């Protein structure tokens, strides 16, 4: 009977796998202060702004036609619109910090095929954001409905579309983090990645808003943020929004398209 050579055993032990790459990326995320602060900021923004906006709506309750179209779920989830910035910045930092310090050369030397590194970062940032944003979304929904209940404006998880909107808010933040990761991988600059993120989510919708009314509505509903946030509403306005899952699908398509472009650059470009 022949025994494996020590060299073969060593090569097997040191073989790069996607699971090992993901463990490495998870360690980087846990030990990077900027990333952890971004994750914490996302949770705080979801909860704090959701509660604050619920209090404001109780102080100024809707009347007439506004009361008929009032969406208590989206009120509680209003913080998602701010938290998307923190989630996106988390994605940017997860890769641009390595370019800033030069660690990316060591990372790519350890993972010569390169792409498993990007997929590992994508999996880790998605998992981390979902893990904290689902409890945050559920908590702020319950808190917001308790506040809105003072004016009999509340709803419950049992109502159609409510659970989807709450979980959709958490999923939206996860995709926002992927969007940030893709932009960071493409631009390889923290400032550039964050600026591009702000431009895509905030500046472009403002510019589109200057177009003639119907054209602005038609184009606006397909923009990343507007499309994705449709999943956080129970009854989206068909004039200005896509249906919930269609809108979320469009948002995912933006993230995947940019992630694909980032993969091409990572595979072909220099570190």
Descriptions of predicted regions:
Residues 88-110, 114-115, 122:
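Transmembrane helix boundary and interhelical loop/hinge segments in multi-pass membrane proteins
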Residues 21, 215-236:
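Short hydrophobic, aromatic-rich alpha-helical segments embedded in or entering the lipid bilayer
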Residues 56-61, 99, 103, 143, ...:
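Membrane-interfacial segments
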Residues 2-15, 35, 39-91, 118-185, ...:
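Secretory targeting signals
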Residues 34, 113-115, 189-193:
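Membrane-helix interface segments
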Residues 190-225:
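Transmembrane helix segments
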Residues 23-41, 125, 194-195:
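Alpha-helical transmembrane segments and their helix-start/interface "positive-inside/aromatic belt" motifs
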Residues 1-27, 256, 260-271:
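Actinobacteria-biased recognition of intrinsically disordered, low-complexity terminal regions
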């Amino acid at each position: 009977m022949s025994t494996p050579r020590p060299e073969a055993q060593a090569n097997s032990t040191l073989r790069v796998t996607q699971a090992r790459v993901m463990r490495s990326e998870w360690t980087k995320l846990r030990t990077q202060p900027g990333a952890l602060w971004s994750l914490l900021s996302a949770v705080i923004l979801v909860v704090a702004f959701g509660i604050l906006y619920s209090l404001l709506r109780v102080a100024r309750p809707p009347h007439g036609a506004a009361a008929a179209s009032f969406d208590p779920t989206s009120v509680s989830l209003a913080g998602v619109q701010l938290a998307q910035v923190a989630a996106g910045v988390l994605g940017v930092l997860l890769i641009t910090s390595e370019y800033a310090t030069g660690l990316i050369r060591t990372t790519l030397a350890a993972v010569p095929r390169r792409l498993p590194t990007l997929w590992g970062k994508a999996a880790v940032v998605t998992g981390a954001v979902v893990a904290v944003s689902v409890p945050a979304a559920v908590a702020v929904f319950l808190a917001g409905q308790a506040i809105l209940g003072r004016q009999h404006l509340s709803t419950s998880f049992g109502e159609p579309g409510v659970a989807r909107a709450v979980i959709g808010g958490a999923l939206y933040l996860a995709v926002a983090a992927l969007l940030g990761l893709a932009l960071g991988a493409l631009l390889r600059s923290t400032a550039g990645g964050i600026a591009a993120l702000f431009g895509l989510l905030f500046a472009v919708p403002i510019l589109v808003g200057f177009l003639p009314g119907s054209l602005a509505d038609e184009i606006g509903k397909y923009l990343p943020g507007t499309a994705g946030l449709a999943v956080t509403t129970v009854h989206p306005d068909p004039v200005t929004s896509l249906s919930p899952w269609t809108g979320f699908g469009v948002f995912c398509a933006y993230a995947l398209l940019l992630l694909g472009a980032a993969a091409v650059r990572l595979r072909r470009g220099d570190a």
